[in-house]
Regions:
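Short acidic low-complexity segments
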Residues: 7-13, 117-129
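Short, acidic loop-to-helix structural element flanking the phosphoryl-transfer center
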Residues: 10, 28-53, 61-64, 80-87, ...
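Asp-based phosphoryl-transfer active-site loop
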Residues: 17-31
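Active-site phosphate-binding/coordination module
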Residues: 40, 46-119
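Short, well-ordered secondary-structure micro-motifs within conserved domains or adaptor modules
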Residues: 124-141
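Conserved Lys-Pro-Asp/Glu-containing loop-to-beta segment of HAD-superfamily phosphomonoesterases
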Residues: 193-223
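Acidic, Mg2+-coordinating phosphoryl-transfer loop and its flanking beta/alpha structural elements
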Residues: 216-249
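Single conserved hydrophobic/aromatic residue that forms the stacking wall/gate
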Residues: 255-264
Length: 264
């Protein structure tokens, strides 16, 4: 059964773990401002010499997310940030550096592929593969557009740099790259995912061998599912992406790995 950590807080469990994977969006900030309580948690972890990774499904390199965190008020812990975009970039540089790609997502995400931007094509028919970082700015709300766009190209490779389906930017809910990837799968395509809940991002961002690990996040489909796949304990923040479904709780639920079946 899960434990409610609302009263005792994470500090009551801190000595049970050597490594913490902590989500950023929904835990450290809401897309607009930092949650001060979360900074106290990070400070407490550092004080107790605990290792942690600020692991986020963001389709941008580490450096871009760090710049954003600085802008909204995070004053340190930059070296602990790791993004799904960084994991994607590593794979793309190793496997697709000289292949032509079609970018699905807003122009602001260009920094993910600026090292090989010369391979970007504007004609979808010329692409060897797709890089999906999100939705086009003029097609942010209607997913049907992407079914029409991609239905003839399900044989191409599709790299999804953010498995999240949705995100809340303040009080506004937005679709993410994962929603487009899901459509691509529904029309028969195969997707290469980077980020939570898929195992590679955990191994790329930290040495997890032999360590007791706690994953902290607000998304059941990525943070919690990823922890369960890895057989890690996990802490669900109920005030995040699932706040409407869990509005009556407003607590933190700790699930140990032996309770993972309850969340499957």
């Amino acid at each position: 059964m899960p434990q409610n950590l609302d009263k005792d807080g994470l500090r009551s469990k801190i000595n049970s773990y050597e490594l913490f994977f902590i989500d950023i969006w929904g835990v450290i900030h809401n897309g607009l401002q930092i949650f001060e309580d979360s900074i106290e948690v990070l400070e407490n972890l550092k004080k107790n010499n605990k290792e942690f990774v600020l692991l986020t499904n963001a389709p941008r390199p580490n450096s871009t997310v760090i710049d954003f965190l600085k802008k909204i008020g995070l004053k340190k812990y930059y070296e602990d940030v790791y993004t799904s975009g960084e994991a994607s970039l590593k794979y793309l540089m190793q496997n697709f550096q000289n292949s032509k790609f079609y970018h699905i997502g807003p122009p602001r995400d260009f920094d993910l592929f600026k090292r090989f931007e010369q391979n970007k094509v504007s004609n979808i028919n010329q692409a060897d593969y797709f890089i999906c970082t999100g939705l086009f700015e003029d097609h942010e709300t209607k997913l049907e557009y992407y079914e029409d766009l991609l239905e003839k190209f399900s044989n191409k490779k599709f790299v999804c740099t953010n498995p999240d389906l949705i995100v809340d930017r303040g009080d506004v809910r937005e679709f993410c790259a994962g929603s487009v990837a899901k459509i691509f799968e529904e029309i028969g395509g195969k997707v290469i995912y980077f980020g939570k809940p898929y195992p590679p991002v955990y191994n790329l961002s930290a040495n997890i061998n032999g360590k007791n690990v706690l994953c902290i996040g607000d998304n059941m489909n990525t943070d919690i599912k990823g922890a369960n796949i890895q057989n890690f304990d996990n802490l669900l923040i109920t005030s995040g992406i699932h706040k409407k479904e869990l509005s009556s709780l407003n607590i933190c639920l700790l699930y140990t790995s032996d309770a993972a079946d309850e969340l499957s």
